[in-house]
Amino acid sequence: MAIHLYKTSTPSTRNGAVDSQVKSNPRNNLIYGQHRCGKGRNARGIITAGHRGGGHKRLYRKIDFRRNEKDIYGRIVTIEYDPNRNAYICLIHYGDGEKRYILHPRGAIIGDTIVSGTEVPIKMGNALPLTDMPLGTAIHNIEITLGKGGQLARAAGAVAKLIAKEGKSATLKLPSGEVRLISKNCSATVGQVGNAGVNQKSLGRAGSKCWLGKRPVVRGVVMNPVDHPHGGGEGRAPIGRKKPATPWGYPALGRRSRKRNKYSDNLILRRRSK
């Protein structure tokens, strides 16, 4: 990721940084308008996810997560910014005239060629089934269900590792630290998702975060008792209980929120690390 630092003319530009060498000029046939409803509310209008709201209007880019252009070579034409995700996207021109967006693999540059299929080279950006990959391969955009498209390891900088193959299943170590089984026939893309340093970029000011649809974060201890279990008291008061709690009164730190008796419990060999 190429970072451009501003000259220190104002406090905002002194601390801010933007991505350079990445344009945002999407193709008209690969975008469509998307109504962003809710803003962290449920169907009754009650806040269920805090600190969300506002933000600039966005056009959704159609991303090819399935990579079903089999055995047809494509060339990376552009590397573009996508407002709907932290990762960059690449515009691919295939040999049969098809044009699609894919997630930008880290290290890929304009002019590189990619291909998807069953017997393709183990090269960055190529997509192939897990059964054809050697152990230790770094992968992203991993399918959970055959033919449904990649669902795992799609965020900026995400990378998983193929650590074992036995029977009909392959064992993967995911970015969260979770180790789980997936069918060997599912496909994945070789390499790591690009823009790995996005979490180190400084926005510089509150307005830049508002453009992204992120509202200010307020501590519960400075709220009123009606708004948060930590609220109330005179001056700087402690939270008034043994353990921290969420705004709805549930234990805040370390409580497991995964549903019990899920179908995938037998597929998870080791839970994700905190």
UniProtKB/Swiss-Prot annotation:
A Gene Ontology term for the protein's cellular component: large ribosomal subunit
GO aspect biological process, one term: translation
Subunit structure comment from the entry: Part of the 50S ribosomal subunit.
GO MF term list: rRNA binding; structural constituent of ribosome; transferase activity
Keywords linked to the UniProt accession: Chloroplast, Plastid, Ribonucleoprotein, Ribosomal protein
InterPro entries named among the record's database cross-references: NA-bd_OB-fold, Rib_uL2_dom2, Ribosomal_uL2, Ribosomal_uL2_bac/org-type, Ribosomal_uL2_C, Ribosomal_uL2_CS, Ribosomal_uL2_dom3, Ribosomal_uL2_RNA-bd_dom
Stretch list, region Disordered: 1-25, 224-274
Alphabetical list of PANTHER family matching this protein: LARGE RIBOSOMAL SUBUNIT PROTEIN UL2M, RIBOSOMAL PROTEIN L2
Subcellular location: Plastid, Chloroplast
Originating gene: rpl2-A
Gene source species: Cucumis sativus (Cucumber)
Name of this protein: Large ribosomal subunit protein uL2cz/uL2cy
Family under the similarity heading: Belongs to the universal ribosomal protein uL2 family.
